[in-house]
A protein has these predicted regions:
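Transmembrane-helix boundary motif in ABC transporter permease subunits
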Residues: 82-114, 127, 284
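Amphipathic cytosolic juxtamembrane alpha-helices at the membrane-cytosol interface
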Residues: 102-106, 174-202, 282
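Hydrophobic alpha-helical transmembrane segments of multipass integral membrane proteins
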Residues: 73, 77-85, 89, 93, ...
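Transmembrane alpha-helices
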Residues: 162, 184-222
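Periplasmic/extracellular loop-to-transmembrane helix junction in inner-membrane transport proteins
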Residues: 7-23, 42-84, 245, 252-263
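Transmembrane alpha-helical segments of polytopic membrane transport and secretion proteins
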Residues: 1-28, 262, 266-284
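Interhelical loop and adjacent transmembrane-helix boundary motif
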Residues: 59-62, 66, 218-274
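Generic hydrophobic transmembrane alpha-helix motif, especially the helices
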Residues: 115-151
Length: 284
């Protein structure tokens, strides 16, 4: 009797399972298709304008050249500086919260602050970075100002991903290492962190992706210069100089055309209708 009831239930569930599987596959195919469509569209539209000279030269009005080499170097520079600061702090904070700190008000406050930082708009980070790092610390528009600001933005991402990665490590690893006489730090360094490394790397990659795509915060902190350093020593001096990333250059390229168009339209209306808004004899 029980076997017949089970078979009847299985048969009645089959249609629902079938439609569920179909819906899941359709959603997955649509997601991949949209991503591939965006990549193909950008590639087809942009491949004509990209060449070796465009990638290896800088934009110069005097020389009449257009390129993004300086912006590529600036982007890599900001990524390296930001990750050198944010990764140790984020991983260290996650290790403390997960392995050392006892559940209580302090841990709750730190986790609440982390979640709050993750939800703040990037423009707010940019304004804070401009006022605190740029003006109060006198770093002005520079790579350091932009990197310090981006560190605050990506810290929650690295911390939360590292925490989740550490939680996936079985407790038997911890108890086994302690039982064999290993110290806690030795156990964390040789067992927990290597076991959680895939999750930590995922957090780092997500943080790098956010840095590469960020423009609002860097517009207020790093500036928009796309110049290349002339020497290896100049590379270190450039840390205190303005530096425009690829997203900043993209933003400026799009907005400058709009500004020129709006300015031209305003001049035409001014000469045609006059300052008082009345018809004028002046020609556009």
């Amino acid at each position: 009797m029980t076997g017949s009831n089970t078979s009847i239930r299985t048969k009645t569930r089959h249609p629902a399972d079938f439609f569920t599987y179909v819906a899941i596959y359709v959603c997955a195919i649509l997601s991949v298709a949209l991503l591939l469509g965006i990549i193909v569209y950008v590639f087809v539209k942009g491949i004509r304008s990209v060449n070796w000279e465009f990638l290896t030269s800088v934009t110069s009005v005097l020389k009449g050249t257009t390129g993004i080499a300086g912006n590529i170097v600036n982007t890599l520079y900001i990524i390296i500086v930001t990750m050198l600061i944010a990764t140790p702090i984020g991983v260290g904070a996650a290790v403390y919260l997960n392995e050392y700190a006892k559940p209580g008000k302090l841990v709750s406050m730190i986790e609440f602050a982390t979640e709050t930082l993750a939800g703040i708009p990037s423009i707010i980070f940019g304004l804070f970075g401009m006022m605190f790092f740029g003006q109060t610390l006198h770093l002005k528009y520079s790579i350091l100002t932009g990197s310090f600001t981006l560190t605050l933005m990506v810290l929650p991402l690295i911390t939360r991903n590292t925490q989740e990665a550490l939680k996936t490590v079985p407790d038997s690893y911890r108890s086994g290492a302690i039982g064999l006489g290993a110290g806690k730090w030795h156990m964390i360094r040789t067992i927990l962190l290597p076991s959680a490394m895939p999750g930590i790397i995922t957090g780092v990659i997500l943080a790098i992706g956010r840095i590469v795509g960020e423009s609002a915060a860097l517009l207020f902190t790093a500036g928009s210069s796309g110049l290349l350093p002339k020497s290896f020593a100049d590379l270190f001096a450039k840390a205190k100089m303005p530096a425009g990333t690829l997203t900043i250059q993209l933003y400026l390229s799009a907005t400058c055309r709009t500004v020129r168009r709006v300015t031209f339209t305003g001049k035409v209306k001014y000469y045609r209708y006059g300052a008082e808004g009345k018809p004028s004899l002046k020609r556009a």
